[in-house]
Amino acid sequence: MIYKTDYHVHSSYSDGRSVPEDYITPAIAAGLSEIGFSEHLTLFKDPEVWNMNPVNISPYISHLETLRNNVKNIKIKIGLEVDFFAGKEEEIYRFLHPLPLDYIIGSVHYLGEKTVDVGPEFYEGKIIDRLFGSYFDSVLAAVASGLFDIIGHCDLIRIYGYKPSADLEPLYRSLAKTMKIHDVAFEVNTNGRNRPLADFYPDRHYLRIFREENVPVCVNSDAHMPLRVAQYFDEAYDLLRYIGFTEMAVFDKRVRKMVPF
């Protein structure tokens, strides 16, 4: 049996639709060895319905620690999905460093004051090539910051199906090389299949680049409801095997190890 994990799961502590307990049975049924919760944390912005108020960090961690002690058939890992903002690295570090987390996912949602997944209207009237360049620059900065263990949906800018005219291979190559240099993992995020894009992040046409650069990988669902835990995982694992990946990144107390799959 393959050792499978799903580290990108959202509960009602941020924008998920259920309490953490509701995700356990579906995770076990999906054959997961570990499930990790990673609530949205957006510092430097006013709390919104989709992200967790920082004052709730302690209750969130305590809740999951209790759940972990009470559940025996699956390992429960505690994480966060943290928005990256260039120039705020030191403040982010000071906030995160004392927390007893197993991993931290770094994500770029914001370009300016708006998130790239707010709706297709964000892209209207804008130069798509420039947007893609700015987005990848932000992700590169997140990778190089040293703050994160995993980079989440590294090309979320694709969410509504917009495509630049420029060749994207150099952007993906630069991203993969930077991930390898800074020893950061990337995720195959299967939730893109549920968005207008209707495919995984990152773009499957460029996944080979991450393999060629030997970047550690994990498969995550980005589930916001229990029925989407480990969704499309068989397809994702088959795709990774086809490309030549043979190991998966797993995390415990911010330490990564690789397990075969």
Where are these regions (language model features)?
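An N-terminally biased module of ancient metal coordination in phosphate/nucleic-acid-related enzymes
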Residues: 1-84, 91, 95-98, 158-170, ...
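Domain-core and long-helix interface of multi-subunit machines
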Residues: 13, 106-213
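Short coil-to-beta-strand
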Residues: 30-37, 103-108, 146
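Short loop/turn motifs at secondary-structure junctions
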Residues: 31, 100, 147-150, 244
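Hydrophobic residues within beta-strands of alpha/beta enzymes
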Residues: 35-37, 104, 151, 186, ...
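Hydrophobic alpha-helical segments and helix pairs
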Residues: 81-124
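Conserved active-site loop/cleft motifs that coordinate metal ions or position small ligands
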Residues: 187-189, 217-221, 247-251
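Extended, intrinsically disordered, low-complexity segments
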Residues: 244-261
